[in-house]
Every structure is written in C-alpha cells, then in structure tokens.
C-alpha cells in the first residue's frame, strides 16, 4: 500500500527540502514538529503541526510533543491485525506510514571541550528515539528513516513501487535505526558515567558503526573490520586498503609523533619506533637523523611527521618503498610526488581530533569480555628527570634534553628492547 502519511522531525536538515518535496509530490500528508514544521512551511509545503494533529500543545519548552497515542498508536498498530485496526479506528488513530527522524546532536555537543552538564542533558533526545523504535518495531508496515543518506533511495523506490517501499528495504532501515539508537544511548551512558568515577566501574558500553572492512587481519586468511570514527582522525588519501596491522601502526605512529613540538620524523615497524629524528627547522634533516638510526627500517615500514609534508622530503620518500606515510598535511608538490607511489597508503592526520580521541581508554579483548586501560599520556619533562638524579655527577642540561627526547621515544617500544635515537 502506498505511503499516505509521514511524520518528519529532524535536527539535521541536510537534504530535507528535496525529500519533503518528493513526498508531497507522491501525495503524502506531512506532519511535523517545531522548527522542522517551520522549515517545511517556509518551502511552501502544506504541513500539519503535531499539536494540531494530537490535539495537545507542545509542553515544557518542546520536551513533550510526540509522546502521544495518536503518534505511537499510528506507528505501532499492525495493519494486518483486525483487532489492532478496529482499536485504531475506535480511538481516532490514523496510520503513520513513514517516520523521518534524526536525533538531537548529543555526541557533537559533548565533544565540545567547554560543554556543561546542563547543555549535554538538554541534547538528550526522548521523543526522537521513541518514534524511531516504534516505527522500526513495526517495519512490516512502516518506513523509518534516520539518515539523510537514505532519502534519495526511498524516493527512487517509491517511484518504482507505486508510492511504497519494499519489505526488504524497510527491514534494512529498521536495523539501521536500532544501531543508531544503541549508539546514541551508549554515548549518553558513557558521558554521564564519566561524570561519576563510581558509575564507570559498574559497566562500560561499546557500540560503533562499521567504518570499513579491512584488507585482512594479522594474516591474509584472517578477516578484520574497523568500527567507529577512524576516518575523522586519519583520512586515507590514496593507496591500498588498510589492514589490521596498518591501523595498529598508524595508532602507534600518532602516539609517538604527537609528543614532540619541534619538527620530527619517526620510522616504525610493527608499532615500534626504529628511528626518530628531530631538527629545529628542516624535516629533511630530521629524516636524515631518523634514517641513519636504521637504514633498513623505512623499507615496508611507516613514516610519520609532525609538520606538513614538504616537496623536499616527499622527493626523498618517493624513492623508497614504504607501506604508510602519515602527516598532518601535504603541500601540492608533495602530493604530486607521492601520488606516484600508488600502493603506499598516504594518510592525513587530524591532530586535534587525535588528541581528543586519545583521552579514551585503550580497549583490548579478553576471554569472555574485554579490558580497559588508561592511555599513557604522561610526558616526561626536565623537572621529572632532575628530581630522579642518583649519580654523583648530575647530568648537564644538554644530557637532560637528550634524556627527555629518548624517554619519549623509548616509551613507545613494546616489551624489552634497546632503541637508539638522535635529536
């Protein structure tokens, strides 16, 4: 049966104009709330305000508007159940065939460094998840849309299927909804849990969308997948698909390089630094120091820098076989040179996003569950070193500076190992 009635209530209005106009062209009655209703009316579309539809006003500054039998009854009652249909008619409940809802931006709000608890709480959506879940539960009859990326697909399908969507599409959209609401609730749980040290000990929630299938795991016969917002931190500009070990190497490289303020180059293999060099001005000089530490390490390894990749260094690297190159930015000449390395994975690192991400604990699987550990974000400074002098002759300032540099490198080495580095 063709979609006849739709309820639209969104925070993100991306693509909404085209979608709403498309629904209107199919003769779909539009019901909406607050700012979304005003937006649709501004487009010249006929819209029924939710308060007119339910017969009840929006209350408590919009906190209560869609939690009503006219809404949830219209979503939940089964069209193939005679008793449901009878009760709906007796209570004046009309079927709502499509729900388009995206949620208050809670995750974006709490990601702000200066967010207050009150601001965070106001971005906890109640009506939105409730409508999404009601519609998703009854996906046999209701099309539920939680992502603007699905708007065009739905309109295309309505065009093909006489104003309706297929059961398979509705099922897929319902699964997407439950993933979204699960992610949303986990974000709220973790944020509020972090406000209380006691509550974080009781449980820990992990839920993230699939980012991409990885090329393989530790070995080619092992499947691997990457979840979460990795791409917001590390943007792959070119090269082969990432593998499981590539992702670990990229994380290790970021941990290493963000400890240094001066121009620095790191070379890593299997997450361990093999050479690190630093210079006051020129990345090429820093590279030369790192390279001379172990001239074999760059081949098939990971190279990371904490300054924009320059043409000079890119020219050197373009002649070497490397698996991954990471930089906060690449100038045009450097990109042109590195593009010739078609298989090399060129990564742009969003340093600010990485520094936020590394506040989260390290998570590792364990039999029957997983473990968490606070990430080692402490940086050993000169004051720390001077306080621990136990030799008869105290180190010189130059020696202390060298120790600090080497300490920051050696903390990235796993297990028992010796490491040489030059500043």
Residue ranges of predicted features:
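Glycine-rich nucleotide/cofactor/substrate-binding loop typically near the N-terminus or early
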Residues: 35-106
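Short hydrophobic/aromatic-enriched beta-strand-loop microsegments
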Residues: 27-31, 44-57, 99, 143-144, ...
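Non-catalytic interaction/clamp surfaces of large macromolecular machines
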Residues: 149, 153-204, 214
């Amino acid at each position: 049966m063709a979609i006849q009635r739709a309820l639209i209530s969104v925070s993100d209005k991306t693509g909404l104009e085209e979608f709403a106009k498309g629904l209107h062209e199919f003769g779909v009655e539009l019901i909406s709330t607050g700012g979304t209703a005003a937006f649709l009316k501004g487009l010249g579309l006929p819209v029924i305000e939710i308060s007119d539809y339910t017969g009840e006003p929006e209350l408590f500054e919009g906190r209560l508007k869609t939690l009503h039998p006219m809404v949830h009854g219209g979503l939940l009652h089964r069209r193939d159940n005679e008793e449901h249909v009878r009760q709906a008619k007796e209570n004046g409940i009309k079927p709502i065939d499509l729900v388009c809802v995206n949620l208050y931006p809670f995750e974006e709000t709490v990601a702000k460094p200066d967010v207050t608890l009150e601001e965070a709480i106001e971005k906890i959506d109640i009506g939105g998840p409730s409508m999404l879940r009601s519609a998703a539960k009854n996906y046999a009859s209701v099309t539920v849309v939680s992502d603007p990326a699905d708007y065009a697909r739905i309109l295309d399908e309505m065009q093909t299927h006489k104003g309706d969507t297929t059961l398979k599409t509705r099922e897929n959209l319902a699964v997407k909804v439950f993933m979204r609401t699960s992610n949303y609730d986990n974000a709220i749980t973790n944020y509020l849990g972090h406000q209380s040290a006691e509550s974080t000990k009781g449980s820990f929630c992990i839920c993230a969308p699939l980012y991409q299938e990885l090329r393989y795991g530790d070995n080619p016969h092992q499947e691997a997948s990457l979840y979460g917002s990795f791409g917001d931190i590390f943007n792959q500009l070119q090269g082969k698909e990432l593998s499981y070990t590539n992702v670990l190497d990229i994380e290790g490289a970021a941990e290493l390089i963000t400890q240094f303020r001066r121009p620095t180059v790191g070379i890593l293999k299997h997450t361990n630094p093999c050479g690190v060099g630093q210079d006051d001005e020129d990345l090429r000089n820093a590279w030369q120091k790192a390279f001379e530490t172990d001239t074999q390490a760059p081949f098939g390894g990971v190279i990371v820098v904490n300054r924009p990749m320059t043409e000079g260094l890119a020219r050197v690297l373009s002649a070497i076989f490397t698996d991954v190159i990471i930089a906060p930015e690449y100038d045009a000449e450097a990109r042109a040179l590195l593009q010739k390395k078609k298989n090399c994975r060129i990564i742009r690192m969003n340093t600010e996003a990485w520094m936020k991400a590394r506040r989260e604990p390290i998570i590792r699987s364990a039999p029957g569950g997983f473990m968490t550990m606070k990430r080692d974000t402490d940086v050993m400074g000169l004051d720390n070193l001077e306080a621990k002098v136990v030799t008869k002759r105290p180190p010189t300032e130059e020696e202390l500076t060298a120790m600090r540099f080497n300490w920051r490198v050696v903390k990235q080495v796993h297990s028992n190992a010796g490491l040489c580095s030059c500043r």
